[in-house]
A protein has these predicted regions:
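Short active-site oxyanion
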Residues: 64-69, 110-112
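Membrane-proximal, lumen/periplasm-facing interface regions of secretory-pathway glyco-
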Residues: 1-65, 75, 82-88, 95-97, ...
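An alpha-helix initiation/capping motif
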Residues: 70-74
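Extended hydrophobic/aromatic segments used for targeting, binding, or gating
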Residues: 81-126
Length: 170
């Protein structure tokens, strides 16, 4: 039952599963985490929304008019859309899977609050890249454990062009 319904604390669930010989099933193409993916994917979203809200609110009102929130994947975007409402965030966008089809939100944007995108990748598109914070959650899937939140200003190319270049369908 604890494997289906989250009855145990995360540490105890991992210990319980190892004790009875259950290894999380591999549902993605990357390494396994401590917990099954259906539990691991639930960790850190509220904290990520709070960090993103701090970054968003650090922008001046004038900057917010020219800004969007872009995430590295649809899970982060969905989490920010859901948890960000109560924090006053605009809907997040992503170039990942079907979120890509909804577009960048404001094609004229010149500032991006980037979530889960490495500052090095942002430097390819923006002149000024300012790291704000990073969320680390040991119970998340290994590829989701580090979520940098960064502000990019001064696009080197039009956002519409960067949007098309960054499309990720998997």
């Amino acid at each position: 039952l604890p494997i289906v319904v989250p009855l145990l604390a995360p540490d105890r669930l991992g210990d319980y599963m190892r004790t009875i010989g259950i290894v999380p099933e591999k549902a993605e193409r990357s390494e396994l985490g401590v917990l099954p993916q259906h539990f691991a994917d639930r960790f850190g979203w509220e904290e990520l929304a709070a960090i993103t809200a701090r970054a968003w609110k650090s922008l001046t009102p004038e900057e917010r008019e020219r800004a969007i929130i872009v995430t590295s994947n649809y899970g982060e975007a969905g989490a920010l859309v859901y948890h960000g409402r109560r924090l006053g965030l605009p809907p997040a966008t992503s170039q990942h899977n079907n979120f890509y089809l909804w577009g960048p939100g404001k094609p004229e944007a010149t500032i991006v609050v980037a979530v889960g995108i490495s500052p090095d990748d942002l430097r390819e598109v923006f002149e000024d890249v300012t790291p704000v914070a990073s969320l680390t959650d040991r119970f998340a899937m290994p590829y989701e454990r580090e979520h940098p939140v960064t502000i990019g200003r001064g696009p080197k190319i039009p956002l519409a062009e960067a949007w098309v270049q960054g499309k990720k369908f998997i």
